[in-house]
Amino acid sequence: MDFNIEEVSAVEREIKVSVPAEEVGAALDATVALYKVQTPVKGFRKGKVPASVIQSKYKKQIINEATTDLINYQINDILNGQSLVPVSKIDVDAKELVRGEDFSYVIKFEIVPEFDTPGYLGLPVEEERAEVTEDELKEVENRLLQSMAKIAPIEDDRPAKDGELASVTFSAEMDGEPIPGVQADNFDLPIGEGHSLEEFEEFVKTLKAGESGETDITFPEDFINSDLAGKTATMKVTVHAVKERKMPELTDDVVKQAGGFESVEKMREIVKQSYTANRKQLNKSAAQTKLISGIVKELDFPLPPSLMEDRLQRMVADVIGRAERSGKSFESLGKSMEELREEQRPVAEESVRTEIFLLNVAKREELSVEPQEVEGALYQIAQQTQQDLSSVKSYYEENNLIVPLKDRLLADKAAEFIYENADVTEIDPVKKDDK
């Protein structure tokens, strides 16, 4: 076998392979020998079938398998010998083996480009200190008390105010016809909490208990029901009662009943610990991202097109998926697919460049991912998607997603390594208004 490697670009390689007739014959003979051992033929004992019978009966299958096996063996031999690691599907342009004739084929694939790795150890980075304010603790206490609140009709004869509830029956019409699904009977509508359209709530706030009325409401362009988006309907409303939440005092008994806490003091302690741990992880993640981004923005190397396209498709799918999960249609985004792709392209480029850099660091530092870590990641995915582990594992294996998953885990390890070796300075938390 002879081969010639052509550098099509910094990220593309083309290899032309020539195979002499002798090797072609040996490859065909090896496949025939396997068929003799493994394939039963009526009238012959297993393993005693003449080669001529095997070649006559299974000619097409033998040629196909011999061609595939020879190419796969030689590709692996060339790639390992030249230390080439494809990051794309290997495209093979080949015909079939013909006994007695030379054979040639061409393979094309993409690789990660070579680049000078910048310094990544001991870099300075600021990280916000994890703190929990008294206001945040009060907010948790208020939510807990709200969960224990008793709902009762107000004594005053007036419409509902923000923070109260209106027991309503409503329906909607368009061109005199009722709109299916936009109706409810004796529904307790929280006022001022954003659970319904603002126009609708404002109208409800004009009606006292026992009063009815109707008003025109225009549905927003991104309304969950795309058939109604941007259209105007007539809402008919009856308010049956105006109610308020009567919250209990914050006592040990109340927090025991609400959340199983021993006391108010213990509840505050547990909440503070939980918030602090969560915030510390978030602050660490933010510092790590800032650290890596600072390195990557100085890098400039071409990206393998297949990696870019794969990452871009996933990011666009994520944007559409998030919109759909929040009840919005793709159309409500107000962008064409091409516009959405171009909007996500810079993000995808940074993501791919970051992963390539981190995998380079992982290789330099001899970091690795163990099989049990991959299994753990698959288990987490199964938990998050509420699927059984075997189904998730099969899906990842059948769609060749195990290697990308390992790469992501390896990149995460490299990012953690860079952070652990950074010069981290703790700073006061930045107020929300200052961010």
From Swiss-Prot:
Protein name according to UniProt: Trigger factor
SS bond partners: none
Coiled coil: none
Keyword Cell cycle: yes
Location(s) in or outside the cell: Cytoplasm
Designated gene of the protein: tig
EC number: 5.2.1.8
Enzyme's top EC category: isomerase
Annotated SUPFAM superfamilies: FKBP-like, Triger factor/SurA peptide-binding domain-like, Trigger factor ribosome-binding domain
Keywords: Cell cycle, Cell division, Chaperone, Cytoplasm, Isomerase, Rotamase
